[in-house]
Swiss-Prot record:
Cofactor(s) demanded: Fe(3+)
Phylogenetic lineage: Bacteria, Bacillati, Actinomycetota, Actinomycetes, Mycobacteriales
Protein name, UniProt field: Chlorocatechol 1,2-dioxygenase
Residues the entry annotates as binding Fe cation: 134, 169, 194, 196
UniProt GO molecular function: catechol 1,2-dioxygenase activity; ferric iron binding
Length: 257
């Protein structure tokens, strides 16, 4: 049976593309170049990356809107289901014994729009290594849940986890996505350092967001255009057992279904 929503979207999409071709007088050689480029994106397995880089921010803004809840942000292509549930107090994201990077302590809370703690929430946390790679998505890293974990709030809604502070990194630039950005559009392919967050709780809309750090050189030129000012966090330094740690704090607010 035909899907009326698909028909509506497909017809308008193809009409827009045809109008674009006419308005810009796209020639047959240009059309063939575009077609070959699209084929190369598929052959490189970069369609998730390409779509995230150019369109996911817009989809995110349409899907979640703004209100008195925490702003959403793109999920990106590096999420992995099944991260371990961290039961330590405080929780510590899995890492190698000699994991390089500045130690980071994250504190915060999960509440609803009236300020009530959401104790049944599950917070998926993941971020890059100190050299900008993600476990399961880099041949340089073992296929295990490195710098990935799930955290649950305490009875008062508070959360705390320890990790390393992520760093800015370039999205893959050797493939067609990076080549388009760098060689043809004249843009860089850097993303500011960020922590990925996905929070689920019964009765609430899932929250997918990213948290950034004040002073990052790529906040104003993120290659994915995903930065929102309300998601940029100040960073303080504290001493824990004689070692300097980076301290960040953020309170999440979820919206009811």
């Amino acid at each position: 049976m035909a899907n009326t929503r698909v028909i509506e979207l497909f017809d308008e999409f193809t009409d827009l593309i045809r109008d674009f071709i006419v308005r810009h007088e796209i020639t047959t050689p240009e059309y063939e170049t575009i077609m070959q480029y699209m084929i190369s994106v598929g052959e490189a397995g970069e369609w998730p990356l390409w779509l995230d880089a150019f369109f996911e921010t817009t989809v995110d803004s349409v899907s979640y809107g703004k209100g008195n809840w925490t702003s959403s942000a793109i999920q990106g292509p590096f999420f992995k289901e099944g991260a371990p549930l961290l039961t330590g107090k405080p929780a510590t994201l899995p890492m190698r014994a000699d994991e390089p990077g500045d130690r980071m302590r994250f504190t915060g809370s999960v509440r609803d729009t009236s300020g009530t703690p959401i104790t049944g929430a599950v917070i998926d946390v993941w971020h890059s290594t100190n050299d900008g790679n993600y476990s399961f998505f880099s041949p340089a890293l073992p296929d295990q849940y490195l710098l990935r974990g799930r955290v649950v709030p305490a009875e008062d809604g508070s959360i705390e986890f320890h990790s390393i502070r992520p760093v800015p990194y370039e999205i893959p630039k050797a493939g067609p996505t990076g080549q388009l950005m760098n060689s043809y559009l004249g843009r860089h392919s850097w993303r500011p350092a960020h922590i990925h967050i996905r929070i689920t709780a019964d009765g609430y809309r899932p929250l997918i967001t990213q948290l950034y750090f004040e002073g990052d050189p790529y906040l104003d030129s993120d290659s994915c255009s995903a930065v929102k000012s309300e998601l940029v966090l100040p960073v303080n330094k504290i001493d824990i057992d004689g070692e300097t740690w980076q301290l960040v704090d953020f309170n999440f607010i979820l919206q009811h279904n």
